[in-house]
Amino acid sequence: SYFLILFSFIPASIIIGPAISLFNILLIDISFIFFILFKKDFKFLSNKTVKLIILLCLYLVFNSVIAKDFSMGAYRNLGFIRFGIFFLAFNYFFYNNYFVNRVLVIWALTLSFLSLDTYLESISGTNILGYGEAYGARIVSFFKDEPIVGGYINGFYLIIIGFLFYLNNKILNKYKYIILIFTIFFITAIILTGERSNSIKAILGFFLFYFLNDHFKFKEKILSVLLLVLVFIFLLNTSNFLKLRYGGQFFKPIISIFQSNNEISIEREANKNLYIALYQSGFEVFKKYKIFGVGNKNYRLETCSNEKNPKYYCNTHPHQLYFEFLAEHGIVGTVILIFILFSLILSKIKIILSSKNYLQLGCLTFLLTSFIPLLPSGAFFADYNLTIFWINLSIMYAVGNKTNVFRFN
């Protein structure tokens, strides 16, 4: 019951704030360490997956040592160890289907309530607690001072949809269309936030998940895609804010670049884009620190310094995963990170597809869309993003007979 409460509280703790989320994860980690010491079961340490995670932790410690400023990245890099323990705790307790079902039902209720609040804010301008006016049409929901609710829903909705398919295969043919509508309910909430990158990831995730879903015939899959496209078009035609976010600020500049035959016009159009400037800045930092990078969380220190390169753009990170890796970890660190992360994710694809475990498939889909090139993203090693990433990775391993690091041993 103790661990059931802590795991059930994870999504709500993220909404309440980073301090509460961190406290909850540390409570899970510390409690699990004592629990595993009491059980004296350390066979999991010989598992290849666990060894890869230990290697990732060791690399991040090394990254702190060679960073421009040790103190800037040390807290983040050393703190990463908690996600390794978090991963093990998920694998141990999600061994039990009863535990999984109880936890994910509460997660589903939490996400549904947050999504309904997003709909309310899109209509009234404020959420149920009155948050939202400070950001105008941008939706914040219960996050109060950060417009990140779209990314949050995107991080959890495939877990919930996968869980509904995973819950009872015998009744799926009867209820699969209800689950499909539930999926579109979540994606619509993401689109309403105006978070373009997360909307693209959510839509691509929808396509991939349902394309690989054997409960739908090919014709049903095509109709599902058309339904989502119609919903998207309807939303754009009924909201000036969404027209601006997706049309004026996203599709129009891309179309202008492709339609122009003049290199000067293309360069001028590209220079108007904030993200192009951020990507260029990230690449400039990489050019200066090619081998090992400037160090995790040191990007801001480099780009905001007094003696800065005119191509630098002062910010906390380059807002794109691959440029972030190159700038802060260099070519060596980027190769190490991509090798470990891709090994953790891609090595299990065949097992997941053959087992037809849709909870695993939902998590896998989210993880794959996290690595789409060029799309803007939050800082990968920031607590909020890393928490959602490792929740998906942990569940993907934990609920499979051939992937759970304890069950496998």
Name each model feature, range by range:
Residues 1-72, 98-101, 105, 163-177, ...:
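Transmembrane signal-anchor hairpin modules in multi-pass inner-membrane enzymes, especially those
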Residues 328-350, 390-393:
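Selective detector of the "anchor" transmembrane alpha-helix that sits immediately C-terminal
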